Amino acid sequence: MSDKTRRTIPLRRQLIGCAMAPLCLAVTNITLAQQDEGLIEEVMVTGSYIRSTSQDEASPVEVLSNDYIVNSGAVDVGELTSKLSVSSGAENNPDSFTSGETQGTSNVNLRGLGLTSTLVLVNGKRQTITAATANDGSVFVDTSTIPMAALERVEILKEGATATYGSDAVAGVVNFILRKDFEGVEFSTGYEEISDGGAGKYDLNLLAGFGNDRTHVTLAGSFISQDPLSSSERPYTTENAVSTLGRSFLTLAPGGVGTGDYAGSYGFLETVPDAACTANGGAPGAGFVPDGAYGPGTGGGGKCGFAYGPRFNIVNKEEKQQLYGNLTHDFSDALSLTAELGWTHHEVKDNPQSPSYPALTFPTLLPGTAGSPFSVPVRWYGRPLGAEAPSPLAPRESDTLRASLQLDGEFDSGWSWMGALTYSENDREVYQPDTISSRLSAALSGAGGPSGNESFSPFDPSANSPELIEWLSYQTFTNKKTDLTVADFVVSGDLFEMSAGPVGFAAGAQWREESYSANRNELYTQSIDPATGATIPVDLIFLGGGLPIDESRDSYALFAEANFPLTSSLEANLAVRYEDLSSDSSIDPKLSLRWQAADWLVLRASASSAFREPSLVQVYNQETSLQGLVDPASGSSSALFVRVNSQGSTALEPETSTNFNMGAVFTPTDNLTFRVDYWRFEYEDVITVENAQGKLNDNPNGADIIRDSAGTLSGVNVAYLNAQEVTTDGIDVTADWMIPSNAGEFGLHLSATHFLSYEIPCTAANDRGCTGDSGVQDVAGYFNYDNFARSIPETKVNATADWRVGNHKIALLAFYTSEYETSRVIPDALVDRGYSQDIDSWMTLDLQYSYSFNLGNTEAMITLGGKNITDEDAPRLFDAANFSYDPKHHDPRGQIWYGRIKLAL
């Protein structure tokens, strides 16, 4: 079992390579493999196209080595990257309420600048975005498609790199490096289980490699199966997940009911709850119209809501299969081939939902119809199926394919060249249940069911036949596809000599073509009225659907970089990239300096510009999602899920940013390295979809706020726009300390990120310094429910301590997230139950023990471990009708124990 070093250069060229270090990423904890005396590997590192042997830390970097990956106990990439201190506001934990479409995916959000602002690479090559879209309109590369069985390390460049890589590398780059030139066969399997709730997860992995001096093949495969964990196992997470739309009625005239469950006299616009609200699993609440709102005897009453929270999962039942292979072949000493092929199939198999969604048409029921006992018309505020019905499922299925072919060569002059063609695609299917609106209307008037003569009663669920319910029900289907084709060509070598050494140089060109399509089944597809141009709503009571889309575009780029050894201790690197987009063009430079101030001290600084072009989704997409909103006009703190209709725009401009980084690397001993960096991003024309809650708060009766005739909220229209600016800065600190001793080898690693500020424009008066819609607000340390920023705890820290002696290894990992605030008004009743503006700080501990031994000619390792071993609950948060914790930063699963075995043949 080994990974061979394939490309070597004479040791005398090491000094030349060190002088050529440009925007290179120093690979912490990775040493250059020396094969024979006088030979050392030459590598191309993330952030540069100039080959170099330098390990000097010219750029801010964090590297997750293979050893760290093993110590983490992570089964998939999302679990690994979710704990990065430099990532804030990513979506790696399942959440049906605020990231329903992205379930089963994972991503990275460097600096909290948005999922779209982090460039994800696989072996230095671009990967297609997933076809899933986040609630805020973000698109991203699904990192869960990265095969863990083949993952060697993760390199994280924590500064803008548009000058090298082009669009999207605004906040930085995450480069997943996969195994190649592996020899032998390695089998591993593991099982983990949540202590409280019993949901298990197991995986099978196989890694194999074989070859000769010229040709080598590496193959990997894995299977992962996850059992579900219902939110009912964590009651605190859903205690506020209550809809105001359960089963209630609003009288449209004064009247009464003589006998039966609804007997009594009612005034004008009085809310009447389900007569058996509590018995039917409902949640009593205040009426829709305040008492006396339209004069004496009007309004009042109480409604019957629906507690939907326990219906949903915290963890869904999922299965994932992955295959990956690469082939390398040396045609000669000056020409080599690398080919890769990868495939991931991922299914979310259950994903339970509410029995049915509420009817946002709010039907009016006349006396004598739909089983109404009232003598006057009433408006129905509710859902066809409630607590008496089972939960339908909303599965998701995704296939991702990636293929890459690369040729590397050398000219007689010593210059190198690289040409590559990479293709990747994602095909995603999403199912979601709903009720057909026209059929419900027919059934309410007595013309429903297969025979056309059945009546649906909202007053007595037992009166509705299974055949009628099936006739009303509909399973929506959405198929979204993305693909990306990239052609790269790069040349690199020594340009000319300076007194301190040669000038390293690289130049190249890139062509990209991407496409995005979305199609839905018939009833879920919106259409356009040819006469007015208006969107015709779909024939469903709740879900809004979307328009079909099939768009593509291409771009071209030219780039160059050079590294100048100004003196024996000072280097300057200059890079520039020109990109010709389908809608615009951009020139982005980058200047970085590295000064070896002393043997133990490196000072570094960089300044660059960056850009990101609007995604095809942001430009062309039009669809409707569901969001839980609190209506300030209702006078209630309760939330209800309504349609949020988002509209893309062809007028969007690219986002631009100016980035700065200053840092120092201290190496007082060979075993201790300490790094500190100050970073700053000035981000302009940030593309975002309008925040529906913020828009509702700013103007509850605006033109884009949709209400029925009684004023009940049913939808909000939002648009993509270049309306925002972000200025953020902070401090990164990392440290590595190796302590050899007679008792074994001790290792300590620390990674911390602290936001000094995260400033965005004010839109309305709030408690974050805004007095109106002018000026800026600092949203670092806030949950940010009412603006486009995601939740931003000011400080995140990861620390690892490990001890190795003989065949034994113990690792302790600590993860800390600082407290932050909600800014949301909390009802007095919830304050009495312990809710507050503060979201508590959170620290969890993971522990792992491994023992290695031989079984004949087989190397074996047994690993036992625990995650969150002190069983810390996710901090409590009031987020209206959503989960009562922040899934962007906290994990409610609690304590998890696991065991693994690995066999190397």
Description of each model-found segment:
Residues 437, 756-757, 813-826, 852-905:
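C-terminal beta-signal and adjacent terminal beta-strands/loops
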